[in-house]
Amino acid sequence: MNSETLAPTPPATLVIASRESRLAMWQAEHVRCALHKLYPSCDVKILGMTTRGDQILDRTLSKVGGKGLFVKELENALADGRADLAVHSLKDVPMELPEGFVLSTIMEREDPRDAFVSNQYDSLAALPAGSVVGTSSLRREAMLRARYPELVVKPLRGNLDTRLGKLDRGDYAAIILAAAGLKRLGLGERIRSLLDPADSLPAAGQGALGIEIRAGRDDLAAWLAPLHHEHTAAAVEAERMVSRTLGGSCEVPLAAYATWHDGALHLRGIVATPDGERVLSAQASAPAATTDAALELGREVASQLEAQGALDIVRALSTASGPAASA
């Protein structure tokens, strides 16, 4: 959080739009508390909403319309004035926002890694051949199939509590979840091991919260500015540029993860086929002192992946899933 910027006094009331899942409400409450600490006289309210993505639980995101299913209703609330800002898990935000909306604020990142959760086993390597592993993302599925072809990977939908419930009743030997969500809800003890990014590269923006507002709300952007975390923002801007450049979506196993070391931003990107048979990898580093530098780093990694044939994978998967994705 950047506390050096003194924002102007906000209005008497601000309304946060949020999904109604326990994790989403925790995130909205986290932002509400941060704003209340900055502006004690401001009454910050939360407008809970059920999105289409929360309602469709019998199919994977890649088959029902992708990440936009989690944000459309929240954007409608911004557009019609019911809410001033919307809080998102950044990995769930489409790479291209609809006209009239902007991501004004990116907050400091939680642990971006994937977590191995099981009631019987300590790690993926400990799972017997044929064990069923649940995951909600094609990215994780592709990496699991590439490194552990002896395991059976099956879809896993629902909110965090629902997914843990399916594990506890024996539907899966293990499940893979974002570590950040578990830690935010005080469920860190459910994590048996954290997956090394070398084995399971995080999704672009994983672990970070983004705040979306209507374009042109410069006053609101100024009030939110103290919550913006520059290092996290540079990292996730680079990551999202990889996906944006390649046309990534929920139909494509694509990952991008950036870290800071000695003043330089190091970015790695991956594009794979869902069966894990092809995994393309690229990486680059740059000082990335500005947003433009971070975006250029993302383009560089995307260009390396393009040279290896990434666009062939993206086009093939997008064509194959086109009709389903519009359902």
Swiss-Prot record:
Its EC number is 2.5.1.61. HAMAP family: Porphobil_deam. CDD domains: PBP2_EcHMBS_like. It is an enzyme of class 2 (transferase). The gene is hemC. Belongs to the HMBS family. Pathway: Porphyrin-containing compound metabolism; protoporphyrin-IX biosynthesis; coproporphyrinogen-III from 5-aminolevulinate: step 2/4. Monomer. Gene3D superfamilies: Periplasmic binding protein-like II, Porphobilinogen deaminase, C-terminal domain. It catalyses: 4 porphobilinogen + H2O = hydroxymethylbilane + 4 NH4(+). This is Porphobilinogen deaminase. The modification S-(dipyrrolylmethanemethyl)cysteine is found at residue 250. It comes from the Bacteria. The porphobilinogen subunits are added to the dipyrromethane group. It comes from Paraburkholderia phymatum (strain DSM 17167 / CIP 108236 / LMG 21445 / STM815) (Burkholderia phymatum). Coiled coil: none annotated. GO terms for biological process: protoporphyrinogen IX biosynthetic process. Binds 1 dipyrromethane group covalently. Its cofactor is dipyrromethane. GO terms for molecular function: hydroxymethylbilane synthase activity. Tetrapolymerization of the monopyrrole PBG into the hydroxymethylbilane pre-uroporphyrinogen in several discrete steps. Pfam families: Porphobil_deam, Porphobil_deamC.
